């Protein structure tokens, strides 16, 4: 369906849990989070009702996120049932891949089309520091397994932080020359824990691109959040997601369901609609989703205000 600004909204990002097995420095506090009561989070059946209702309003792309979505025991069942909705054409997942190696085959059989893997360093010690304890070898094994079973495309999402991992930019780019893997560099945002790092850690996509004169622009879909490039010898592309330096609101086609059951029409707006109260009434649920999509804000104002208006943390929203 169209929002009141004429944008076609066909993409729903679903945060199935706010829990995670890592505590990345820009996402979670060092002490982790307090586990929510079961009644305060969306159950599998409730999530599926929202997905089903959204599909009736023109949503045909679903991405499951977290926290870490693979913590959810029924994620394969959720993917399978989603794949049986005839109007859903694309089912993706964003994961840290710590648990992916043992589950990627069943997920692909269930209907998962592609994965984005959050990976902010290729160095074992640095990865452990950024994630506060993560084992990078589990991520590498998951990538290898995903490639071996033909999961395509595989994208690596990398949040670039000045003085922390910006010296690895070339290493990440060069992966596209060796493997059929896409890279997405994401600008650090002043949201949640990222506020603490933003002043000293922010580096713009433009600055990175300007250092690499051999990058070749690639035609990009209007609704894409990334500007795409590649090297002459690349197997896949290199994308730059630039919410701070070059916002993409005019072509935004997505809304987000949080693990608590609120629908966020804009990642960086405090406006959201509680859907959990309506999952028992299909007509009311459809009406509330329709209302939220129609009233999606025209744009965020992070560039001007240097801060997200969202009161939620990234692990609660799913990015």
UniProtKB/Swiss-Prot annotation:
Give the top-level enzyme category.
lyase
**What does the record note about the cofactor?**
Binds 2 [4Fe-4S] clusters. Binds 1 [4Fe-4S] cluster coordinated with 3 cysteines and an exchangeable S-adenosyl-L-methionine and 1 [4Fe-4S] cluster coordinated with 3 cysteines and the GTP-derived substrate.
- Which cofactors, by name? [4Fe-4S] cluster
Reactions catalysed, as given in the entry:
GTP + AH2 + S-adenosyl-L-methionine = (8S)-3',8-cyclo-7,8-dihydroguanosine 5'-triphosphate + 5'-deoxyadenosine + L-methionine + A + H(+)
Where is the signal peptide, in residue numbers? Answer: none
Instruction: Tell me the ranges covered by the Radical SAM core domain, including all copies.
Output: 4-227
Q: Which SMART domains match?
A: Elp3
GO terms for biological process, alphabetical = Mo-molybdopterin cofactor biosynthetic process
Q: In which pathway does it act?
A: Cofactor biosynthesis; molybdopterin biosynthesis
Q: Which InterPro entries match?
A: Aldolase_TIM, Elp3/MiaA/NifB-like_rSAM, MoaA, MoaA_NifB_PqqE_Fe-S-bd_CS, MoaA_twitch, MoCo_biosynth_MoaA/MoaC, rSAM
Q: Where does S-adenosyl-L-methionine bind?
A: 26, 67, 118, 189
> Can you tell which superkingdom this protein's organism belongs to?
Bacteria
What's in the keyword line of the UniProt record? 4Fe-4S, GTP-binding, Iron, Iron-sulfur, Lyase, Metal-binding, Molybdenum cofactor biosynthesis, Nucleotide-binding, S-adenosyl-L-methionine
Residues annotated to bind [4Fe-4S] cluster 1: 20, 24, 27
> Which residues does the record give as [4Fe-4S] cluster 2 binding sites?
249, 252, 266
Under Enzyme Commission nomenclature, its number is 4.1.99.22
Q: What GO molecular functions are on record for this protein?
A: 4 iron, 4 sulfur cluster binding; cyclic pyranopterin monophosphate synthase activity; GTP 3',8'-cyclase activity; GTP binding; metal ion binding; S-adenosyl-L-methionine binding
**What are the binding positions for GTP in this chain?**
13, 63, 94, 155, 254-256
How is this protein organized at the quaternary level? Monomer and homodimer.
Read off the NCBIfam families from this record: moaA, PRK00164.2-1
Relate the protein's function as given in its record.
Answer: Catalyzes the cyclization of GTP to (8S)-3',8-cyclo-7,8-dihydroguanosine 5'-triphosphate.
**Family membership noted in the UniProt record:** Belongs to the radical SAM superfamily. MoaA family.
| The protein's name | GTP 3',8-cyclase
Q: Which organism is it from?
A: Clostridium botulinum (strain Loch Maree / Type A3)
């Amino acid at each position: 369906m169209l929002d009141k600004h004429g944008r076609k909204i066909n993409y729903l990002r679903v945060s199935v849990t706010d829990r995670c097995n890592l505590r990345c420095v820009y996402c979670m506090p060092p002490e982790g989070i307090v586990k929510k009561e079961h009644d305060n989070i969306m159950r599998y059946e409730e999530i599926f009702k929202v997905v089903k209702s959204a599909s009736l309003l023109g949503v045909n792309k679903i991405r499951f996120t977290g926290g870490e979505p693979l913590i959810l025991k029924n994620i394969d069942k959720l993917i399978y049932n989603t794949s049986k909705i005839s109007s859903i054409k694309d089912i993706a997942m964003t994961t840290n891949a710590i648990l992916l190696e043992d589950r990627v085959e069943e997920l692909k059989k269930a209907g998962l089309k592609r994965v984005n893997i959050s990976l902010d360093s290729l160095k074992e010690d640095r990865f452990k520091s950024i994630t506060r304890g993560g084992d990078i070898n589990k991520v590498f094994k998951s990538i290898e397994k995903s490639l071996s079973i033909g999961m395509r495309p595989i994208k690596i999402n990398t949040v670039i932080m000045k003085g922390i991992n910006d010296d690895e930019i070339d290493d990440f780019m060069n992966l596209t020359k060796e493997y059929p893997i896409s890279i997405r560099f994401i600008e650090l945002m002043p949201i949640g824990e990222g506020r603490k790092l933003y002043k000293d850690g922010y580096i713009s996509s433009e600055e990175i691109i300007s250092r690499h004169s051999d990058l070749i622009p690639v035609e990009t879909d209007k609704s894409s959040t990334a500007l795409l490039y590649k090297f002459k010898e690349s197997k896949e592309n290199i994308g730059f997601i630039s919410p701070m330096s070059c916002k993409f609101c005019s072509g935004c086609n997505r809304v987000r369901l949080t693990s608590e059951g609120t629908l966020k029409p804009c990642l960086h707006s405090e406006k959201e609609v509680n859907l959990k109260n309506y999952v028992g009434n299909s007509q009311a649920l459809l009406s509330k989703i329709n209302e939220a999509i129609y009233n999606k804000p025209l744009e965020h104002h992070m560039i001007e205000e240097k801060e997200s208006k969202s009161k939620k943390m990234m692990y609660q929203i799913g990015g």
